[in-house]
Amino acid sequence: MGRKVTVATCALNQWALDFEGNFQRILKSIQIAKGKGARYRLGPELEICGYGCWDHYHESDTLLHSLQVLAALLDSPVTQDIICDVGMPIMHRNVRYNCRVIFLNRKILLIRPKMALANEGNYRELRWFTPWTRSRQTEEYVLPRMLQDLTKQKTVPFGDVVLATQDTCVGSEICEELWTPRSPHIDMGLDGVEIITNASGSHHVLRKAHTRVDLVTMATSKNGGIYLLANQKGCDGDRLYYDGCAMIAMNGSIFAQGTQFSLDDVEVLTATLDLEDVRSYKAEISSRNLEATRVSPYPRVTVDFALSVSEDLLEPVSEPMEWTYHRPEEEISLGPACWLWDFLRRSKQAGFFLPLSGGVDSAASACIVYSMCCLVCDAVKSGNQQVLTDVQNLVDESSYTPQDPRELCGRLLTTCYMASENSSQETHSRATKLAQLIGSYHINLSIDTAVKAVLGIFSLMTGKLPRFSAHGGSSRENLALQNVQARIRMVLAYLFAQLSLWSRGARGSLLVLGSANVDESLLGYLTKYDCSSADINPIGGISKTDLRAFVQFCAERFQLPVLQTILSAPATAELEPLADGQVSQMDEEDMGMTYAELSIFGRLRKVAKAGPYSMFCKLLNMWRDSYTPTQVAEKVKLFFSKYSMNRHKMTTLTPAYHAENYSPDDNRFDLRPFLYNTRWPWQFLCIDNQVLQLERKASQTREEQVLEHFKEPSPIWKQLLPKDP
């Protein structure tokens, strides 16, 4: 009997409800795995229908078409002589489960339902599925007739079960189960399971790869064994980008690493590993062995098939390797770029339209598109036929082969500087120079005529003409005049996106890109239905701090020196009149806080789950060397006042690439009301009382502080009760 096994895992760019495309990608991955000598192939979570079907899981069609794809896979000669592990939704006794279906040679060996469902952040699995809660128990699943006719089986095992081959034992985890405190791999490993598989639907978040790799290596470090992780990759229909990172680990070390960001629709990893290395590693850990004697056994499905071959002495084994991580700046350069590529080719539009202001945010969006063009050119040069076909379809030229990212950018990206009488020459120059360097088709236009026309209608109807504060107007007039400019830019962006190519004699329309960052969205520092309103936003989930680091990275990586000028310029909306030809409006002055402070507020609010009072308490210590308690209180109250006042803007926010755990995305990730009492009277009074106590304590002698300590504090609610008449 052999001792070396060759196993395969993969990352597939599946698309929700694209059953034909998903089927072909699954089939191709199996074919590649067999070609590399693998005897077991693992695919991503729910790969047959695509992970992001959301409420389509409620539809019987989704279940039906998934079964049809499974039948097609079972019937294909490609799937013969290799154990195939695929993911799909299954209805069992009128309950819907997220399942793995494991089959070999037209026979379904077992169905393993997911036991721990992801239901936080962007995940809502409990809305569509039920977890299997019967540990180490199985039932008989009655196959639909279309499968009975094909497999000649009436029922198959369904439940928490492992697979015993002639030479080893394989157990399944599904995505979230790896992240739970009591992961199934622990008991499975103690019960003699030597190979653990994990089919994931895990999306990208900046700096998340470290956690994923640590979980896998730790799982095999404490308990020994081989661990395969498969994941989806790409944009499968919404704000999330699934970032691959397929991997194979053994005994705490990585033996195969997949790409995190790639335009390849199918990526297959294989490793040849020695089962005796697993057995000797496990047997040496005496504390593990003692626990193994107490573990309850798993039901086993046996199969007359081996993952090893009998004559394998000369078969080379894979070597351990160090995982290569991307810097956050690289992640921003690659993740959103791949997401944009998927969105563009699958939407069948002809390119992007980007309002380019000359500031950091729109420059970052432009750089992401340029990075996308670089990835496309590299993929074509490496022989990726699918990318070549896609780009030929986009430019409507069957003989076209992209060679230069700048030339491709000129075909796919139209940028536009929309000047007003409040715009400076500096921002105009920076926008024009950046467009020249990346090669985009660039337009310069003035919005003043449109602004005057809109204000003329208002003046005609009311007999009044609003003025800026600099010209003696009120704050209401000042804000209205700023918003008119911003909203006209949005209208013009959509007009030019729809007709720009038509005016040039080319086919198709363009997707409008937004450039509002996550910090400005959190505070509401944007005009509702301005240029933040777009089709998609590649930077909407990224903080200003990370964006500045990313733009600095692009300046060096892509040799774009104008980005240094953009970084050194003050952030400004340029919606108010210039003062002696110079910009007088600064973003951080308008907001009343710095972008760095705003990032801290965002993380405390969402990640640390801090309301106004808790945030104040945390910041007292964090900012003790920079601000007094009174100043901290003022900043916290200002943030929550503005945040709650502007929360309604999140309900119409442009769909943005999800990249941060403190995103205020109202769609699914950050569910909050949008009508608040913006005075926060109870919460702010708690803060004010704490400030008074701190100030009083600072002015007291030591004896007075001791006496104060033993006084009964006045309850907060007594201060809020109505006073007696």
From Swiss-Prot:
Free-text tissue specificity from the UniProt record:
Highly expressed in small intestine, kidney, liver and testis. Weakly expressed in skeletal muscle, spleen, lung, heart and brain.
| Biological processes annotated in GO | 'de novo' NAD biosynthetic process from L-tryptophan; NAD biosynthetic process; NAD biosynthetic process via the salvage pathway
Provide the alphabetized UniProt keywords. Answer: ATP-binding, Ligase, NAD, Nucleotide-binding
Asked if the Swiss-Prot or TrEMBL record annotates the protein with the keyword NAD, the reply is yes
| Ranges where the CN hydrolase domain occurs | 5-275
Q: Active-site positions, per UniProt?
A: 45 (proton acceptor), 114 (for glutaminase activity), 175 (nucleophile), 357
**Per the record, what are the reactions this protein catalyses?**
deamido-NAD(+) + L-glutamine + ATP + H2O = L-glutamate + AMP + diphosphate + NAD(+) + H(+)
User: GO terms for CC?
Assistant: cytosol
Self-association and partners: Homohexamer.
The cross-references to NCBIfam families, in alphabetical order and at most eight, read:
nadE
What is the protein's name according to its record?
Answer: Glutamine-dependent NAD(+) synthetase
